[in-house]
């Protein structure tokens, strides 16, 4: 389950129209932010704009993580009822159709032995000093969407890079932190970086799938 300890006003409630604080948007993005109208998204069947891969890990909710096969990790969200697939051992196919979750190429960082084929240099340069298990995921082929529910945009040219670091507390609680880096040459003048924490629950009894909401 996601543990929200920061950015409460942007994550736990729908931000006010025009509130893009802390996101490095440019003038073109500002026009879209100021024109946001959730009714238009609903009428167009685009309620899931804020549930695409660049934003979904910031949406409060629960995850189900399982292996679809030896080279594909499946991540399901109850918020928005979304499914992400992390593909090991390859790159995004040319000419793939854009979707909310895009195509995610994954690899374990150097020194990690796990399922999935190892790869080199999917995204940013390898980090140093990380002791926990680290998974790197690079996502492209995205449909344009929102970084926040109030219409802060990202474009179809966005590249999403994520690092997943798993660790165990002395109490035995299992956690992971995902560092999310959104690079968008259309609407951001520098990459937008966040970190988000998740804690493992005892079972899946609190899972509550909900549809996307534009409001």
Question: What are these model-predicted stretches?
Answer:
Residues 1-215:
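PEST-like low-complexity, intrinsically disordered acidic/proline/serine-rich tracts
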């Amino acid at each position: 389950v996601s543990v929200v300890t920061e950015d409460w006003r942007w994550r736990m409630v729908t931000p006010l129209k025009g509130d893009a604080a802390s996101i490095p948007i440019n003038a073109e993005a500002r026009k879209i932010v100021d024109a946001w109208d959730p009714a238009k998204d609903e009428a167009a069947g685009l309620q899931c704009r804020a549930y695409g891969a660049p934003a979904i890990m910031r949406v409060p909710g629960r995850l189900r993580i399982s292996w679809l096969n030896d080279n594909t990790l499946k991540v399901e969200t109850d918020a928005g009822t979304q499914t992400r697939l992390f593909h090991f051992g390859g790159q995004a196919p040319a000419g793939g159709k854009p979707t909310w979750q895009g195509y995610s190429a994954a690899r374990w960082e150097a020194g990690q032995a796990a399922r999935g084929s190892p790869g080199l240099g999917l995204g940013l340069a390898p980090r140093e000093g990380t002791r926990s298990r680290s998974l790197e995921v690079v996502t492209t082929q995205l449909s344009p969407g929102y970084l926040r529910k109030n219409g802060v945009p990202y474009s179809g040219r966005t590249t999403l890079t994520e690092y997943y670091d798993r660790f165990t507390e002395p109490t035995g609680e299992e956690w992971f932190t995902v560092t999310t880096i959104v690079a968008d040459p259309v609407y951001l003048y520098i990459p937008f970086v966040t970190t988000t924490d998740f804690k493992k629950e005892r079972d899946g009894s609190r899972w509550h799938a909900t549809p996307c909401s534009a409001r």
